[in-house]
Every structure is written in C-alpha cells, then in structure tokens.
C-alpha cells in the first residue's frame, strides 16, 4: 500500500473471495483473472456489497489509465498528507488526558489500562505547566480508595504529604510528587500546616519558619527574582545576597532558590520570614530587585552581616526608587515610584531598552538628584542640603554618586562611595549620556593627561559636591562634547556660554547655585587638562577664551566654517565651546584633538554634515578638526530644547 497512487490501492484481481465492502478494504473480484487496478476508495466500492452481484463478489473498478499516467500522477497526494487528512484528531485533545481520571473504574480491564505506565506518563505530561488544581477539583478517588483522611487533610491543612490511607496508583492526580510541576519550588509543595503564606501551591512557607527562603514572583520572565534572606531580621525584604547584587541573569549564591513560584500575581510577595523583616517592597512591586530609572538593577540594601543591617543606601540610579528597608531614612522613596512605572527591571546587560521613566509623583527629595535624568532638576538646589556622602538620606550620598556616575555613563571606582560593592562595575556603564555628540562612551579615558587622576567619569562625592557648588547641571552633564567629564569643577555649559545663563538659547539646560561669586568658569580642555579659571562676568570669560583660541593656523583651519573664513569672535567661541583645541601641539596631533574616545579616531571631522563645504585636506595633511566646527554650532541652537525634552523622556 505504500506505493498507492492517489487513494487507489494497487490490487491484483487474483485475490479471490468476497470484497471488503465499503470500508476501504478494496474488494477484489474473483471472476476476472486479469490484473486490474481496483479502487480502495469507499465511494467507489460503496455500492458493491458482498452480496451485490450473483457471483457473491464485487466487480473490480477498472481505471482507464495506469498509475504511471501523468494525469494520475498530478492528482497524487503525499502519504503524509493523506495520513494527516484521514487521521483522527481526537488524540490531540483527548478528554481523558485533560480531565482527571474517573473516580470509580468502569471495569477491571479499564482500570488496568489506566494504570499502565503509558497512561500514567501521558497524564503526567498533560499536567505540566498547569496550575495546581484546588483540593475540591482534585480526584475524589482518594476517598473511594480508603485515603479519606488524607484527602481531608489535603483540603484543610494544606499538608500534601499526609496521606493516611494506602497510596494507590489511582491517586496520581492528587499526589504531587508524580505530577511534574517545573514552576513550583521544591520546598514550597510541603507547606507547614500553620503556614498559608502565599496563595496557590507556591511561595509562602510557614510564617513561623524563618529559615525558609521565599522567592518573589516576577511577572516577566526576563530576570530571576531575588530571594530574601530571611534568616536575620535585619535584612529587608529585598535583601540581596551578602556579596552585593546578583547579576540580572539570576544565578549567584542563591540561584537554587530562584525558581519562580506558580503564583501569577505580580504583587503577591509571599513573605517567608518571621514578622521581624521589614517588607519594604510595595504590593505593586513583585520583585526584590529595584529597577532604578536608569535600568540599573542595583539592590540597594547591602546585607551587611555585622553592621547596621538593612541600611538603605539611597542609591537612586538616575531617578527611580531605592528600596526602603525600614531602617534607613530614605524609607518613603520606594512606595509609589516603581509600582506604577516599570514592571520588570530593565537589565543593564541587555542593551536596547528605553530606561528612563518620567519623574514619578512620589519623588521624595525636593532637589532630588535622583531625578536628574528622569526629569528636570529644580532651578536651584535648596540650601542646607546635606552633602555628607555617608548618610543614606543626604542628597549627595549614594544618590549623587549614582546620579553623577549613572548620568555620565560610568561606574565609580571601587571603595569610593557607599555604592561600592552594591553594584557590579559594569552596572552603570551603559550609554546613559543622552547627548548625541558625546564621545565618552563606556568610560573611555577621554582626556589624554587629565583624566588619569580620576579614572574617566568616576566621581568622588567630594568632587560631586564641588560640582554642585559650581553649578554643574545633571540633566546635561557638561557641554556637548563633554570635555570635562572627569573634572567636575568645570561648569555645565561650554566655555563660551557660562552655566549662569540659564535662559540662553544655546544652552537651555544649565543651572547654577545662587550667591556664587565667580559663576563663569572657563571650560577649556587641552591635553594638559581643563583650564577651570573663574570669572565674574561673561565678557571676561569671552576675552579669556580668545587667549585659548589664538593659535597659529586658525584662519587656515577655519576656512571651512560656513559663515566666515576669518576668525570671528563667534567662530572662536564656537571653537572654544565645541572643539577644545589646545594652544600647543600640531593641529592634527592626538593631544590636540583631545578626543574623548578611542573609537573615534578621526574625531568630529569623521561625522558627515551635508551642508558644510569643508575642503578635504591633501592626503598627507592632518585632519582639519575645526572644519567640522561650523556644523556643530547650529544644531544645539536649533535642537537644544528638543534634545532636553527627549532626554527626559528616555530618548536614546
């Protein structure tokens, strides 16, 4: 039959005897001795019953064309298709596998069939992934098989192993050991009778058993949940493992407990601890990992065994919540921030997610640098703000460290702030700088000699405090090229436009502290380091900048400037703002370019601008960097406001 063309079976008519009738058996006539192609189609044979002819046999249906004919070959169907078309699809949704076994077996033979290993395997496989059936909907065969007390204990106390009757194979629906549930924790199926912590079959071990670790059910499968270490009451409900933060891929020392509970609720954080643990995670926040606004999964509660346990370092990484552990003064920050915004933590190890939400309503501090990237900072920081980096509630503490380091796209040196140890070094190295012209990607050691002292963007809290004093804006960390990422004492906007001009159309994002005697800071950065001279007025600063810009060959290099080929003051200011060409060195030397990134070898001149008619140099000539100066003066005047709002909206 394997070579059957279409549905016609190749039958030799020498098969004597009565036909198989209409069932598709292919009746073959005994009268004719010639080989003929008899049809096995039930429609062809349906009229020829066994008694339909006087000879008692069916007349064979003779095809006019042999099977090798092209017309018949064209009508053939593959055997796989035939099997799919004629197969009974009931085995896919077989009711016996989807519903529990009947409580009373119909016959002993059927009961034996149900107890066969294949049937048990099929039933076990059919229950994979299904939620735990409630005790009422479970099999009632326990009661009929003498396990009535066990069934009652299963419903009342939740003790699934208290089978008092003899365990029979028909208890397979009730006995949880045999139905494989890959999503339930191994320890959570055996609930203590007094427990009832979380719902369903998972999660909440006994309330009195403080040693059982309970995992939070994270609604999304992107990250493994944190499992609170509830052994000591000092650790908060989102306490991380003692090493600091588990990587967002799960694993770590407590990876064995990271199996997800079958509770589907994102809010149900089943506390497995005795009531001493301060549960600082709000109900809408179903995971212990705090996803800060920068997508930086910093578990902010360092589980220090001997120190003041659970002290919440309020490390708001660029504008979301720190989990309040109940003992630190930053307790109000966590309640309303993340419950409405991000559902799942945005992993810093997986790029491509927009991470910055709008500033939440529950922002706690009035001048909160936590919202430095999430929204706009206040115009002036309040006076008397504690700049002590050791207090968790202070502005600069871990917040400024995280906001400064996070906004500048770099991590902090180890041990320099409370954040050290609470986050892996690569957590804050995502490209968090929203400035499209920023070259300091991934903490490139930007300045040739200047940045060596304070490893690229990593800021000390003292430098951050000095930055606040000098009016350093955290929405746009520095001027467009970020020449002074490592020098926080340099001001916000570029050299030509001081940060005090908050309403300046070119730099709308600068803000300053009031009562600063010398608010205008020279931002010029050369290979020798930043200038950082302070001036009282912008005119003095501009005249000082002319000393930086007067170097030989400027007219020649500025010939590509769109407006003028002479060294106008605007061109000088533009070069002062954007190019930071030092006074010494050949025009194309690496020290001159002061480029802040190793993978921008050609610097700004490699960026194509369609409207700049910069003459290309001769092949041996150095790269004419200021030829690209002109095109980079206008975009900030045109798009400065738009870039600012886009950065607040998480535009990358």
UniProtKB/Swiss-Prot annotation:
Transmembrane segments: none annotated. The modification N6-acetyllysine is found at residue 213. The keyword Nucleus applies. GO terms for cellular component: nucleus. A zinc finger (C2H2-type) spans 520-548. The keyword Isomerase does not apply. Residues 1-11, 221-230 have a biased composition (Polar residues). PROSITE patterns: ZINC_FINGER_C2H2_2. Residues 16-32, 145-157, 194-209, 264-283 have a biased composition (Gly residues). Residues 135-144, 231-244, 314-336 have a biased composition (Low complexity). GO terms for biological process: G1 to G0 transition involved in cell differentiation; negative regulation of cell population proliferation; negative regulation of gene expression; neural precursor cell proliferation. May function as a transcriptional repressor. Belongs to the Elbow/Noc family. This is Zinc finger protein 503. It comes from Mus musculus (Mouse).
């Amino acid at each position: 039959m394997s070579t059957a063309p279409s549905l016609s079976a190749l039958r030799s008519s020498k098969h004597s005897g009565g036909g198989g009738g209409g069932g598709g058996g292919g009746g073959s006539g005994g009268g004719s001795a010639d080989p003929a192609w008899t049809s096995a189609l039930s429609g062809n044979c349906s009229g020829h019953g066994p008694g339909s002819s006087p000879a008692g046999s069916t007349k064979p249906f003779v095809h006019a064309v042999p099977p090798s004919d092209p017309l018949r070959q064209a009508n053939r169907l593959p055997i796989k298709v035939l099997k799919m078309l004629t197969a009974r699809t009931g085995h896919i949704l077989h009711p016996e596998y989807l519903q529990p076994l009947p409580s009373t077996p119909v016959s002993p033979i059927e009961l034996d069939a149900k107890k066969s290993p294949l049937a048990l395997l099929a039933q076990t496989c059919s229950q994979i992934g299904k939620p735990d059936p409630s005790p009422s909907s479970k099999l009632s065969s326990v009661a009929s098989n003498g396990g009535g007390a066990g069934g009652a204990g299963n419903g009342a106390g939740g003790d699934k192993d208290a089978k008092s009757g003899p365990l029979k194979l028909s208890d397979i629906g009730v006995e949880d050991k045999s139905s494989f549930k890959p999503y339930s924790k191994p320890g959570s199926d055996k609930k203590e009778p007094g427990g009832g912590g979380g719902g369903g079959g998972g999660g909440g071990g006994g309330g009195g058993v403080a040693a059982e670790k309970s995992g939070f059910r994270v609604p999304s499968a992107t990250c493994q949940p944190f499992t609170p270490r509830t052994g000591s009451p000092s650790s908060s409900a989102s306490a991380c493992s003692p090493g600091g933060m588990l990587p967002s891929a799960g694993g770590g020392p407590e990876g064995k407990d990271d199996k997800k509970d079958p509770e589907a609720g994102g809010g149900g954080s089943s506390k497995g601890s005795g009531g001493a643990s301060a549960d600082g995670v709000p109900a809408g926040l179903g995971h212990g990992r705090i996803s800060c606004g920068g997508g930086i999964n910093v578990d902010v509660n360092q589980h220090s065994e001997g120190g003041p346990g659970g002290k919440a370092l309020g490390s708001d990484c660029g504008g979301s919540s720190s989990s309040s552990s109940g003992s630190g003064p930053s307790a109000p920050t966590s309640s309303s921030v993340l419950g409405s915004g991000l559902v799942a933590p945005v992993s810093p190890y997986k790029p491509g997610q927009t991470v910055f939400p709008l500033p939440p309503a529950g922002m706690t501090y009035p001048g909160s640098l936590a919202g430095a990237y999430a929204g706009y900072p206040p115009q002036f920081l309040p006076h008397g703000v504690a700049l002590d980096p050791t207090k968790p509630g202070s502005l600069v503490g871990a917040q400024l460290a995280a906001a400064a380091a996070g906004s500048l796209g770099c991590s902090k040196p180890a041990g320099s702030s409370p954040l050290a140890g609470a986050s892996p070094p690569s957590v804050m190295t995502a490209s968090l700088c929203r400035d499209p012209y920023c070259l300091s990607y991934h903490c490139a050691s930007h300045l040739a000699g200047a940045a060596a002292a304070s490893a690229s963007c990593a800021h000390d809290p003292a430098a951050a405090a000095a930055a606040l004093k000098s009016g350093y804006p955290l929405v746009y960390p520095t001027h467009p090229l970020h020449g002074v990422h490592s020098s926080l004492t340099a001001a916000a906007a570029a050299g030509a436009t001081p940060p005090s001009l908050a309403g300046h159309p070119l730099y709308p994002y600068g803000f300053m502290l009031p009562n600063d005697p010398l608010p205008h800071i020279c931002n010029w950065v050369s290979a020798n380091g930043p200038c950082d001279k302070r001036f009282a007025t912008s005119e003095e600063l501009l005249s000082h900048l002319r000393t930086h810009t007067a170097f030989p060959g400027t007219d020649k290099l500025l010939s590509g400037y769109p407006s003028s080929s002479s060294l106008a003051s605007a061109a000088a200011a533009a070069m002062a703002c954007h190019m930071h060409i030092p006074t010494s060195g050949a025009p194309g030397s690496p020290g001159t370019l002061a480029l802040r990134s190793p993978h921008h070898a050609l610097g700004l001149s490699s960026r194509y601008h369609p409207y700049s008619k910069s003459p290309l140099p001769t092949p041996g000539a150095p790269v004419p960097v200021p030829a690209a100066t002109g095109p980079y003066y206008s975009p900030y005047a045109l798009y400065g406001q738009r870039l600012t709002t886009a950065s607040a909206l998480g535009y990358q």
